């Protein structure tokens, strides 16, 4: 009986390969150019695959038996029957056994239409079944497709093989060990890539993403603009929110959509960027410089006398009656609407309190 000691016997001859040679064949190449030629006793492209009876060794002994390889090793191996009259292969090894995982996968030719072989994945278990301990050693076993009786040539007799323990003269096996460390390295690379992507995101978008968790209940509400028409006394401009974005309007239309804390710069006026309440950082300050020629919202004549509850705050100079407007609006809003939000006019009334310098939302 052949010794199971990997140190016994001379090492297999090393193939004469050019520098930089790598052996990474596809499944089709392994079956067509190596296994099929080996079964037909035809010359191989290169003598790089050793002939070893894998089931007489434990998997950690096999790298020393290989002709070539560093992380994975290839072998031609015979396959025996488990029982003389059965078709099941014998998977027992020296100190354990190989267990198949999943179903056989067909190996197709490059055109994708012809089946040239079968691939089976196996895992090595130490001990005796069924209480074996699963290891990290993996085997991919390639075998040729079986010849159907109607495809066998006339006069071909396999009677001598029926009573033999030999199931296949040759199968081709790839052996490797799963490396948990490499998987951790791959995960670290994924995390590094995610961090790199987030570092490339502008701070305004990052802050917006961080604050979305505080406003998940608004996601089922229409994303249309929450527009509150009204008129302000004195020079200034209007601010409103549409759920995730804060926009500034002048008399002609939108000047800036500042999201949660973005910044825009143009000409002449200062404005405070709004930031949703969160623990991610202090309030962001933004400067908006632009000449605002019209101090009022564009409203129709019939809306000039609209009730204070349908007006919104202006921010800027001369806002003498802004606090009165805020007080009136809060007084006329039902308590439930003040707590949870409700429909006011055509939009959603948001009661989120923003700390704006010089402006008291709840002053009477």
Curated annotation (Swiss-Prot):
GO terms for cellular component: nucleus. One of its GO terms (molecular function) is transcription cis-regulatory region binding. The keyword Nucleus applies. Residues 9-18 have a biased composition (Pro residues). Disulfide bonds: none annotated. It is found in: Nucleus. Induction: By Jasmonic acid (JA). Its main location: nucleus. Transcription factor of the NAC family. Together with NAC018/NARS2, regulates embryogenesis by regulating the development and degeneration of ovule integuments, a process required for intertissue communication between the embryo and the maternal integument. PANTHER family: NAC TRANSCRIPTION FACTOR 56. This is NAC transcription factor 56. It comes from Arabidopsis thaliana.
């Amino acid at each position: 009986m052949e010794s199971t000691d990997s140190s016994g016997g001379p090492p297999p001859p090393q193939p004469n390969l050019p520098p930089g040679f790598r052996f990474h064949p596809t499944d089709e190449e392994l079956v067509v150019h190596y296994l099929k030629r080996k079964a037909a006793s035809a010359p191989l492209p290169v003598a790089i695959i050793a002939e070893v009876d894998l089931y007489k060794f434990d998997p950690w002994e096999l790298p020393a038996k290989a002709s070539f390889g560093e992380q994975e090793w290839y072998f031609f191996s015979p396959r025996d029957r488990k029982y003389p009259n059965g078709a099941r292969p014998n998977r027992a090894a020296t100190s354990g056994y190989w267990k198949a995982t999943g179903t056989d996968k067909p190996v197709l030719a490059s055109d994708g239409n012809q089946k040239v072989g079968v691939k089976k994945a196996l895992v090595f278990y130490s001990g005796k079944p069924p209480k074996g301990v699963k290891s990290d050693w993996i085997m991919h076993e390639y075998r040729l497709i079986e010849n159907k009786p109607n495809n066998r040539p006339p006069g071909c007799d396999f009677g001598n093989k029926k009573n033999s323990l030999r199931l296949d003269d040759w199968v081709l096996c790839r052996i490797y060990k799963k490396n948990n460390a490499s998987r951790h390295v791959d995960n670290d690379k994924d995390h590094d890539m995610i961090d790199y992507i987030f570092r490339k995101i502008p701070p305004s978008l990052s802050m917006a993403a961080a604050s979305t968790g505080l406003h998940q209940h608004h996601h089922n509400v229409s994303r249309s603009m929450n527009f509150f028409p009204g008129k302000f006394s004195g020079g200034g401009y209007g601010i409103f929110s549409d759920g995730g974005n804060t926009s500034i309007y002048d008399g002609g239309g939108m000047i800036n959509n500042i999201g949660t804390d973005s910044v825009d710069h143009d000409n002449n006026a200062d404005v405070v960027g709004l930031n949703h309440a969160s623990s991610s950082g202090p309030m962001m300050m933004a400067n908006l410089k632009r000449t605002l020629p019209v101090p009022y919202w564009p409203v129709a004549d019939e809306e000039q006398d609209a009730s204070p509850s349908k007006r919104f705050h202006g921010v800027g100079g001369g806002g003498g009656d802004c606090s009165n407007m805020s007080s009136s609006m809060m007084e006329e809003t039902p308590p439930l609407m003040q707590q949870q939000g409700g429909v006011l006019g055509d939009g959603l009334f948001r009661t989120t309190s923003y700390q704006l310098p010089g402006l008291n939302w709840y002053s009477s």
